[in-house]
Amino acid sequence: MAYSFFGVQVAFKRVARDPLRGQLHDLLARDAAGRQSVGAKQRFWGRVYALLTNAPIEYGNWDLVRGANAQDQFNEWASEIESSVATDPDRAGASAQRSSSSYVLATAIFLVDRGSNADQTLGNECDIPESEWLTRQTFARLLAIFPQLNFANVQADAVYVVPGADRDGPTARELISPDYGLTLLS
């Protein structure tokens, strides 16, 4: 079976008393196990989109890979994020300066059947001139894809939110490093 991979990463400044990171974590904790049906996945991703739409996104990265490398790309994104979360030292108690410069990183990845209506949605919505790939407007458009997908044609999906509870997230310098590979959006 041939697939297409779609991945989006967005980062926004972690602000004291801003509930967004907590709301994302609560959504994942509450709905992660119970979103196996097509309808449940549709509702879940609609809620993820609704939360991320309110985020003041500063950095981002995205990719659409169709064909032979799609499944490898999905697995690579997932394993790199999972291994970084597992090996990232606990940053609890870090300095106030670190906390004030910390970001929340949200990543969404999808593996869809090649040629399906979900794949066509990705093709239509990701047909963006290269000069516009890294703008806030483009990322708003990319996030809006989540609730549009027909999850009957989505073979795998995942969402990650870093940092976890009581931890500082990556800094702007870390986000643009080769480890993260994000770009400051225009």
Label the predicted regions.
Residues M1-V65:
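N-terminal topogenic membrane-targeting module
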Residues V10-F12, S79-S186:
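Membrane-proximal, solvent-exposed terminal domains/tails of membrane-associated proteins
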Residues P19-L20, A70-Q71, R167-R173:
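Short, solvent-exposed polar/charged micro-motifs at secondary-structure junctions
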Residues Q23, L27, V48, W77-E80, ...:
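Residues that form generic nucleotide/phosphate-binding pockets
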Residues A33-S37, N69-A70, A78, D127:
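Alpha-helix capping and helix-coil boundary motifs
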Residues G46, R66-G67, G164, D168:
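Charge-rich, low-complexity amphipathic helices
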Residues I57-A86:
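Long, folded non-catalytic interaction modules
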